Structures are given as C-alpha cells and as structure tokens.
Amino acid sequence: LSNPPFSLKNWGREVAEANSYNRFNYGVAPASYGDLAFVQHMLASLNSKGVLATVVPHGILFRGGEEGKIRQAMLEDDLFEAVIGFPQNLFYGAGIPASVIILRKNKSEDKKGKVLFIEASQGFVKDGNKNKLREEDIANIISAYESFEDKEKYAKVVDIEDIRKNDYNLNITRYVDTSEEEEEIDIEEVLGRISER
C-alpha cells in the first residue's frame, strides 16, 4: 500500500530509460508525470502472487501518450483488479480527486479479464476545509471490493474487451453510471398552463 507524490515532475526519467533493473517493462512514464513510474517500480518489486494498492491522481486513468501505452500494456497483461474513485480534497496538499488502483499479478479465475470500478467519490463528510471518509463509506468500499459484483450507481465489473473499445480509458464515470433519471416533462401540459395565465 502506498501514496507516492502526485504527478511528480523530474522524477528521473533519464535514469529509468536505461531500465537496468527491469522496472519499466511497460514503458517509461513521461518526464512531467512520474505516477506510472512509481506504479511500475512497485509492480516490479512484487513476487508472482503479489498485490499492490496505491493512491494515484485521476489523470493516470485516462491521459494518453506514453501513459496510455503503459496503461494499455498493463491491462493486456490483466494486472488491474480494481479502480476506486475517492472524493476530491481528501488528502492534504492535493485538492484534486484521487483514486486507488489495485493491481494483482495472479488474479483468481473469476476475476481474470475483468476490472472492478467503484465510484466512491460521493461518500464523505466535510471536516473543516477537507473531506473525510466515514466508517460507513469505508465499509461500503470494502464490501464492494470483496463482493466483486455490480452495484447500481456505485460499482461495475467490466470486461477487458469493453475497456479496449474505450481505448483503454479507465475513467470511472465511463463505466459506473451515477446520473439521476431526469423527470419527463409533458410539454402539452406545460403549454396548457402557460396559456391559462
């Protein structure tokens, strides 16, 4: 479990390009965003049954270029097990929304070829100028992760094929629909009320 610095600039790309320790097998992260460099370093440190969970900025879920290629390669190797979206303003020094990604080197058969998305960004309480997860928010996240099944407006299990069709974009709202159904408006009724005035 880790919380590396968000979008670290000048993280040491020039050293990583040599890749003498085979830490960056999925590609070298861009010089201006070190997020996936940290993720790959952690991944390379795992044994064959290892699991990692790390806090990342949302940008790594959808940015293109080198990050998109790294994300694609990691998805094709079936490493992503879950992507959990958290509220903005949760961490000191970072007002942007964050996610936790869970990568597993040896997924169980029932999870192979699938990624669980959890949209937990609305579960919090204001605490001064920060947002804070309550016990029930944490319990909901754990329950959704452990059950690894769809939960309306909260969690969705998505096949890798669907992620491929979305250009390997892992933006949570692309998969978990949290929109509220809009009330239908009867135009005839509204026009009738207007004409009565």
PLM regions: where:
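A conserved structural/catalytic subdomain of Rossmann-like adenosyl-cofactor enzymes
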Residues: 1-197
